[in-house]
């Protein structure tokens, strides 16, 4: 999970509920990342696959271990802060589906303050299109629509 040679690998999950809303976590981090919304996920442990890391991190950050992963939908490299250092992170995003509307995630700010997570919410695709807030990955609504076969 460390930033080895200023590179880090991470798995993330784009969780959709039955209404195709996507779960995002708000991170308040030092520059270069700053305040942004992103999918649950995090760094790989030694010997761990991207998908296994995505599942583990989703469970750690939300308590959910029953989200079905439907396959990889995106790869990206982005600049993050990790352990007080800027590093490049190679990320693989997996589409996940939950069969229920989940309204409670608990106090993520208290549980994950050390990770910079300060809030969570479900976003509709039109809300993602309209927001002026920074969303990672960029173009998330289009990625989801492409996977769901929508425009």
Residue ranges with predicted function:
Residues 64-75:
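A short coil-to-beta-strand element that immediately follows conserved catalytic motifs
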């Amino acid at each position: 999970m460390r930033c080895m040679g200023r590179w880090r690998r991470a798995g993330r999950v784009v969780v959709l509920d039955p209404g195709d809303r996507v779960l995002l976590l708000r991170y308040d981090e030092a520059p270069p990342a700053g305040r942004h919304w992103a999918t649950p996920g995090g760094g790989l442990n030694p010997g761990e696959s991207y998908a296994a890391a995505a599942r583990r991190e989703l469970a750690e950050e939300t308590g959910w271990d029953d989200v079905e992963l439907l396959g990889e939908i995106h790869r990206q490299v982005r600049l993050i802060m990790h352990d007080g250092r800027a590093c490049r992170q190679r990320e693989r995003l997996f589409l996940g589906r939950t069969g229920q509307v989940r309204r409670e995630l608990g106090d993520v700010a208290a549980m994950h303050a050390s990770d910079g997570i300060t809030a969570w919410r479900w976003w509709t695709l039109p809300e993602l299109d309209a927001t002026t807030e920074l969303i990672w990955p960029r173009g998330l609504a289009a990625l989801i629509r492409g996977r769901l076969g929508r425009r």
